[in-house]
Amino acid sequence: MFKVENQSELVTAQKDFMDVVYPVVEHFYTIQGEGAHTGRASYFIRTAGCDVNCWWCDVKESWEEEGHPKMTVRELVKEAVESKAPFVVITGGEPLLHDLLPLTLGLKSAGLQVHIETSGSSPLSGQLDWITLSPKRFKKPTEEVFAYVDELKVVVLTNKDLKWAEENAAKCPEGTKLLLQPEWETPKSIDLIVEYVKENPEWGISLQTHKFLKVP
């Protein structure tokens, strides 16, 4: 778990954190399709804005903040609670471009667990129960993020990405869930990953099962 330092002072500084707004691309109740929590019911909040801009990204509309509606913490918490999801996944875009303290406090005060999917390119913020780090070679994660990583999920296209995966795994805490994920439009990466995992069984495979299931 990651908790921001001096939390009480920061909360006091926010007159009413429930009224803080975030640019939101979409929010929805679905099944987590990737990673360690695949198959679990979850509520997704996709923030707008990204400084990584992966060419294979399937939500390029999330890159720019402009043009997306602003939603308050109060509104987002209400939607998440009404869905009856056991946990919320904050994703993007790159969600850590925003101060997540108000949003995560609101969600946790409602009894929800908070997960995040991030490239780690910006400093951690907020209260986070599960951190999935998906690092990119062209926008490296901050060093501070590694101490808090619960799950390392690396998108693989070529052998270079396998080397990159190992470099990042070496910085993660013992017990971190290690996953390799094929890039959806690069099927040849599947054979590469399968053989690598057979030879290195500390790694597992993450698939984008939501695309097979045809759910958001």
Where are the predicted features?
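Conserved Radical SAM active-site core
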Residues: 3-10, 18, 22, 41-42, ...
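A short, compositionally biased domain-edge/stem linker segment
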Residues: 6-13, 29-31
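A general boundary/transition motif marking the beginning of the first structured unit of a protein
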Residues: 15-16, 185
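Short, charged low-complexity linear segments at domain edges
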Residues: 16-41
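Flexible, active-site-adjacent loop/turn segments at secondary-structure boundaries
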Residues: 26-29, 34-35, 61, 144, ...
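Conserved AdoMet/S-adenosylmethionine-binding subsite of the radical SAM
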Residues: 77, 96-216
